[in-house]
Amino acid sequence: MSEKKINLLDLDRKGLRALFTEMGEKPFRADQLMKWLYHFGVSDFEQMTNINKVLRAKLAARCEVVAPEISSYQKSADGTIKFAINVGNGQEVETVYIPEEDRATLCVSSQVGCALECTFCSTAQQGFNRNLTVSEIVGQIWRVSHFLGFQKETGERPISNVVMMGMGEPLLNLKNVMPAIDIMLDDFGFSLSKRRVTVSTSGVVPALDILGDNLDVALAVSIHAPNDELRDVLVPVNKKYPLQEFLAAIRRYLAKSNANRGRVTLEYVMLDHINDSTDQAHELAELMKDTPCKINLIPFNPYPGSPYGRSSNSRIDRFSKVLMEYGLTVIVRKTRGDDIDAACGQLAGDIRDRTKRLAKKRMQDSQISVTIN
């Protein structure tokens, strides 16, 4: 049986340098290879003309460059593109490209499904299958960059920002997420600024501390409720890591970080008559008084079978005004791609559910009980 080839997209620069050293080559060859892979999108070793023929033959014998394929895509009226990415075994994750005047953002997935059970999120209702590999994470950027067009003459890439807000909880896949981020930030990789790579988390506290000890990127936190009682229902990981523990971990992260400029981005999905009253706005402002933040209010994006509705514009406006009275920076997020189910909370993909959550969900949908405000 032939030895399985090494997928070079699974290795950050440290891993590539170790590989070249083991092959009896100079470590700087890793820098050359990364530039071909990530600046120019080249996967054919024969096109890597500043690498000698003998080494190209060695690489072809032992290594490969394999990114997951795009199965299909949909384009929204606002220019947003949702990609279905085939990650093997008949399963797909979803990746969303969001073009704006001053940036082009790619929302990438970190898991096939999600192990958390946030009750308002379509991905969470699908259950969980597995973590994505490094090559499957960076491969989303690589493949979409090919779709959009690498600038092969200049090395300019079509994606300026990456947000890890797709399917899955990134901090439950740190083993693969951290080297993937290393590749995003590396000057020979995708060469993104640490302020242009955002990791979002629902509050896996120990993993947030590990992330802060190893990487400095922008942080977004999914709060969605101003107290533990409601958050236990909406974001069940809160039962293990309550709000005060989560906020303390956020402050520890901010103390180590330059990318966040001293404040975290707080994500708060607006659920009609669930978490959107003015009393809850006051409660949220008091909760965050010791944690510097800017607050993104996200109009809920309904999906089939969801027990929640979207807050009215008037309720969102009143909620926002209360927060601003406390001197907080508040942004009401403009919904993008909702006509193709590409908006926040709508990503579902095609998941073989190891948790059997879909079957459980059918029995539990009518049992969700939250205080109406």
UniProtKB/Swiss-Prot annotation:
E.C. numbers: 2.1.1.192
Pfam families: Radical_SAM (PF04055), RlmN_N (PF21016)
Main localization, broad class: cytoplasm
Domain Radical SAM core: 100-339
Listed GO biological process terms: rRNA base methylation; tRNA methylation
Recorded catalytic activity of this chain's protein: adenosine(2503) in 23S rRNA + 2 reduced [2Fe-2S]-[ferredoxin] + 2 S-adenosyl-L-methionine = 2-methyladenosine(2503) in 23S rRNA + 5'-deoxyadenosine + L-methionine + 2 oxidized [2Fe-2S]-[ferredoxin] + S-adenosyl-L-homocysteine; adenosine(37) in tRNA + 2 reduced [2Fe-2S]-[ferredoxin] + 2 S-adenosyl-L-methionine = 2-methyladenosine(37) in tRNA + 5'-deoxyadenosine + L-methionine + 2 oxidized [2Fe-2S]-[ferredoxin] + S-adenosyl-L-homocysteine
Protein keywords: 4Fe-4S, Cytoplasm, Disulfide bond, Iron, Iron-sulfur, Metal-binding, Methyltransferase, rRNA processing, S-adenosyl-L-methionine, Transferase, tRNA processing
GO CC list: cytoplasm
Residues engaged in binding S-adenosyl-L-methionine: 168-169, 200, 222-224, 301
SUPFAM superfamilies to which the protein is assigned, alphabetical: Radical SAM enzymes
Record localization: Cytoplasm
Co-factor remark: Binds 1 [4Fe-4S] cluster. The cluster is coordinated with 3 cysteines and an exchangeable S-adenosyl-L-methionine.
Binding site for [4Fe-4S] cluster: 114, 118, 121
GO molecular function: 4 iron, 4 sulfur cluster binding; metal ion binding; rRNA (adenine(2503)-C2-)-methyltransferase activity; rRNA binding; tRNA (adenine(37)-C2)-methyltransferase activity; tRNA binding
InterPro entries: Aldolase_TIM, Methyltransferase_A, RlmN_N, RNA_MTrfase_RlmN, rRNA_lsu_MTrfase_RlmN/Cfr, rSAM
Function description: Specifically methylates position 2 of adenine 2503 in 23S rRNA and position 2 of adenine 37 in tRNAs. m2A2503 modification seems to play a crucial role in the proofreading step occurring at the peptidyl transferase center and thus would serve to optimize ribosomal fidelity.
HAMAP family named among the record's database cross-references: RNA_methyltr_RlmN
UniProt xrefs under NCBIfam families: PRK11194.1, rRNA_mod_RlmN
Further remark: Reaction proceeds by a ping-pong mechanism involving intermediate methylation of a conserved cysteine residue.
Protein name in the entry: Dual-specificity RNA methyltransferase RlmN
